[in-house]
Amino acid sequence: LSSEAIEAIYLEIFAVSRNLELPQKVAFLGPVGTYTHQAAESRFGAMSSYMPISSIEGVFRELNNGEAKYGVVPIENNTEGAVGITLDCLRKYENVKIVAEIYMDIHHSFVSLNENLSDIKKIYSHPQGYNQCHKFLDDHNLNSIEFIPTKSTAQAAYLASQDPSSAAICSKIAAHINKVPIMFEKI
């Protein structure tokens, strides 16, 4: 087994044993299928109860009100740096503390119901995901296609699943949840 597989097994065993005591309510920046959702599941395992929340501050409110025991929000990424709203919420909600960090490699996929790149008329994605993939877009002459910003890459995948003339930049899991074929991985 690879070291990644061993680590994944260890984390799942750890999460299951912790949840045998009491299933955890975990709030995360949603919707389902976001990278934050993936991070939450990798840390807390299959036995926890997950609550997708539409904003970072909303996750903090759930924690502050006792509706969730843990929250998962982005705090930093390699391309855009610190996530300002998360830092602001850490100052505002003084009783909410960081108890663990989750390091996660982000790998975007380019997905579409359409098999022909030349037939794609618009690309959905969160602005951050779109900006992170500028080299891919340039290399495939896609940077002139209309970009439609979304609240999350998971929402982008959903919208692409409804329109064959569109594509999305999203996570692999968001593509699978929304049944949108992956044209390119790790873009």
Predicted regions: what they are:
Residues 1-187:
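Domain-level signature for soluble enzymes in the chorismate/prephenate branch of the shikimate pathway
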